[in-house]
């Protein structure tokens, strides 16, 4: 009978100090959707004015416009009349869709996410975009209570999660 030995190999390198945020910022590009909406971080320089500008710094949250689903949500959302509408943003992440809903004229936006980091980051993005009509909170749809009906429901999250929450 053979005996197996487990071998652990450790290696140590010294890495020069560098500003990792600066390195990340170099590779983080702004996004333009349909030549109508600029999605950028605060550190990006504005080179052209667009009808809608969203300042989104993602930190640890999902929703920058770089992912195809977010890009498509923003593109589709710009085709919907939001004026004086009540909007729900389920699984809001960075609050990118909430901010756009506000800028498109929504009367009130209810945004929520199960992740506390996302809600914290989303709150920062809501504030930097001066969106005062967004109510933002942590929790699942089944745990939160909303009064009245919504005209628009936005949900850039997994289909199975949605089905689990609404059935």
Where are these regions (language model features)?
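N-terminal auxiliary segments of SAM/dcSAM-dependent transferases
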Residues: 1-48
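Conserved SAM/SAH cofactor-binding pocket of Class I
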Residues: 60, 64-142
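Short alpha-helical
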Residues: 19, 116-117, 160-161
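Short glycine-rich anion-binding loops that position phosphate/pyrophosphate groups of nucleotides
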Residues: 44, 158-160
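A short, charged helix-loop
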Residues: 52-58
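A short, conserved alpha-helix within the catalytic core of class I
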Residues: 161-167
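A short acidic, Gly/Pro-enriched loop at the edge of an enzyme's catalytic core
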Residues: 143-152
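Amphipathic alpha-helical repeat scaffolds
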Residues: 125, 155-157
């Amino acid at each position: 009978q053979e005996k197996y030995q487990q071998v652990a190999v450790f290696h140590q390198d010294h890495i020069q100090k560098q500003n990792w945020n600066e390195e990340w910022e170099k590779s983080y590009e702004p996004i333009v959707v349909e030549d109508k909406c600029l999605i950028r971080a605060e550190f990006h320089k504005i080179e052209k004015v667009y009808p809608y500008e969203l300042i989104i710094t993602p930190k640890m949250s999902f929703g920058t416009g770089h992912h195809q689903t977010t890009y498509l949500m923003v593109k589709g959302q710009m085709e919907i009349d939001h004026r004086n509408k009540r909007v729900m943003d389920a699984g809001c992440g960075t609050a990118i869709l909430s901010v756009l809903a506000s800028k498109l004229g929504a009367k009130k936006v209810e945004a929520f996410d199960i992740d506390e980091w996302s809600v914290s980051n989303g709150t920062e993005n809501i504030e930097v975009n001066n969106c005062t009509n967004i109510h933002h909170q942590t929790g699942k749809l089944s745990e939160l209570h909303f009064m009245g009906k919504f005209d628009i429901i936005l949900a850039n999250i997994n289909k199975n999660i949605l089905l689990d929450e609404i059935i």
